[in-house]
């Protein structure tokens, strides 16, 4: 599971734009 910080950052960026 080496996709924690990178994936989380990418998801947060997408969710941030969607939640705009």
From Swiss-Prot:
Keyword rRNA-binding: yes
Keywords, ordered alphabetically: Ribonucleoprotein, Ribosomal protein, RNA-binding, rRNA-binding
Gene Ontology cellular component terms for the protein in this record: ribonucleoprotein complex; ribosome
This protein's record includes keyword Ribosomal protein: yes
Gene Ontology molecular function: rRNA binding
Membership in a protein family: Belongs to the universal ribosomal protein uL10 family.
Function: Forms part of the ribosomal stalk, playing a central role in the interaction of the ribosome with GTP-bound translation factors.
Assembly, per entry: Part of the ribosomal stalk of the 50S ribosomal subunit. The N-terminus interacts with L11 and the large rRNA to form the base of the stalk. The C-terminus forms an elongated spine to which L12 dimers bind in a sequential fashion forming a multimeric L10(L12)X complex.
Protein name, UniProt field: Large ribosomal subunit protein uL10
């Amino acid at each position: 599971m080496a996709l924690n910080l990178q994936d989380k950052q990418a998801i947060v960026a997408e969710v941030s734009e969607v939640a705009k």
